C-alpha cells in the first residue's frame, strides 16, 4: 500500500508538470496564467491547511504521552540535550557545506542576467530575533494562541510542562494520559484520511508552479539550480553516510521507510506536509513514541538542514553576483550569524528568504539581490523541504540509538511495535 501511494504521488507530480506546461503555452499572458494557477493551487492550499489543522493536537498529544511515559525530568533533559547536540552539529555542517560549495563553484560569477538596482525593494519584511527575544518567544503567552498560529516550539514547551506534571502525579493522572493517548490515535487516523489527498495536492502544486513560471526559468537559472541541488545531494550522502556509521546497512532501510514523506515534502515544498507521515514511518524502524514525539517537533525548529545550506549558498551567490568579495573571516562570521538568526524563524512564511534578507543587510550586500532568486525560490524550496525530512528523520533515529533503543533489529515485520 505504501509503495502504491508513492507511485501515485509520482504520477501526480509528472501529470502536474505536463498540465502546467500546457497551461503555460496556452495562456502565455502572466496575469491570466497567475489567475489559472491560483485556481489550480486551491487544492494544494486546502491540503496544507488540513495538515496544519492536525499538527498542533498531534504534537501536543504525542509529546505529552511520551514525556509522561518517561517518568522523570532527568530523562527529558537528557534526551533534549542529546537532540540539541545533534541539531547544532548538523546545522553547522550544512552551513559550512553551503559556504564551501559556493566558493568552489562560484555560481554568481559571469551571471548572464541583468542585476536588480541595489535600491530596489523586495517587499520582504526583514526581521530577526535577538537572543533575548528568541528566549522570550519560546514561552507561549497562551497555549490557545500558540496552537492557533501553529507555533511548534511554544507547543513543545507547554507540552513538556504538561507531560512532566502528569508524570509527577503518577496514578492520579493515569486516566488523563490514557485519554490523551487515545486522542493521538484519533489524530493519526485523521492523518490517514488526509494523506489520501496527497496525490491531488502534488498534482496541483506542480501544475500551478509550471503554469506561472514555465520550464524556461530553470534554463535561465540552470547553473545556480543545478549547483544548489548538487550541494543538496552531497548533504544527503553525508547524512546517510553518518547514518551508515551508526546503524550500518539498516540506515538504507530507514531511508527507504521515509521515501513517501520525502516525496511529499519535495512535491509540495512543505516540510510540515510530511510531518505526520514521518512520525508514522519512524515507528516502523522502530523508534519509541516518546523519542519521536519529543525530538521530531524540536527538529522542525532547530534542525532545518536544507534551509541552513541554502542560506549560506544564496547569500554568497548574491555577493558574487554584485562582485562583492567577503574575506574568509567575514564568511565565518556570517555562518555563525545565520546559525543564530535562523533559529527564531520557525513558522515564518518564506523563512529562508527573510533570514537571507536580514543577513544581506548585516554585511552591506544589496538586499535587492534577493530578486535574483525569488522567482525560482519555489523550485529550491522543494529540495530544502525534502532535505529537512531526511535530517530530522536521522536526528530522531540517532537520539533513539544514543538512548539505548534497539532501532536496527532485523525482521521488522516480526517485531512488536515499540510503545
PLM regions and their residue ranges:
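Membrane-interface alpha-helices at helix entry/exit sites of multi-pass transporters
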Residues: 74-82, 189-196, 284-300, 328-329, ...
